[in-house]
Amino acid sequence: MMYRTSGTQLNLDYTTENDFIKKFKLANSLVPLSIALFANSSIVEKKDSKYLSYRSKVWQETSRGGLPEIFLENIDFEKYADFVMDYPILFLKKDDKYLSGKNYKFSDYMNGNIQEINKSLPSIDDLGLHLSTIFTENRLKQYIELRSMDTCGWNCICAGPAFFTGLLYGNLDEALEFISKWEKKDLLNAYKDAPMKGLDTNLMGKDMIYWISNLLKIAEKGLEKRDFIGKSGTNETKYLEHLNKIINNKETVASHVINKFSKFQNLEDLYDK
């Protein structure tokens, strides 16, 4: 499954608990937009899957994935820890052997209630292993891990970090204010629709193009505020050009691929010669 659902993952730091609360809420609220904007998994086994992001559709149907409603709230470290403790264990590792989690929760492990391992208690490594098997759209480790983007070409791979860096690092408060009226039920509905509808996904009565175009402006201001100058003498805003092109043309990479595939019915024509 991992080989067939390749994604671009992004790790971003936080400075304080309050900083984490803000960044995590924003990152999770942007998941439907991220799915729509970075969609690039439409062809499956040489056929049009009828989804723009088949990868996202697959992960939404797993028992350990998804976008928990609590992630759209102001979740702090304690609430996230409670979420982790209440999450079923996928597997245990003891003496270099892997054992089934058997529907135990990590809280059972913490309380020494797992008979199969003689009621032993978990180590930090055991907690790290458990955290690595929570496949939500975003998750907390020593950093915030963003996981909702499809893998794509070089321009797109650079654009993702630039977009989220501009918002979460450069212009966090303005971005949060912009999304402050979004309702959880609308976000969750958009999350379900985005893999198939892409930029046409409805959120609060407007399509993704409206929301993303405004967020791109906020991200651009954030990157300009950071003013990180590269060897070329330009700042990070240049990496947003690919996303602006998608919005201006109203065509994601997935849509472009579907159009070419529909015309030629040949995967080879999707690659530059």
Role assignments for model-derived ranges:
Residues 105, 207, 252-253:
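Short, structural beta-strand-to-alpha-helix junction motif
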Residues 137-139, 143-232:
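Substrate-recognition/cap regions that form aromatic- and gly/pro-loop-enriched pockets
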Residues 28, 41, 45, 164, ...:
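Residue-level signal for alpha-helical context at structural boundaries
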Residues 219-273:
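C-terminal amphipathic alpha-helical interaction region
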Residues 50-57, 186-189, 237-251:
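Amphipathic alpha-helical surface "interface" segments used
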Residues 1-139:
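Loop-rich catalytic cores of soluble enzymes, especially ATP-dependent carboxylate-amine ligases
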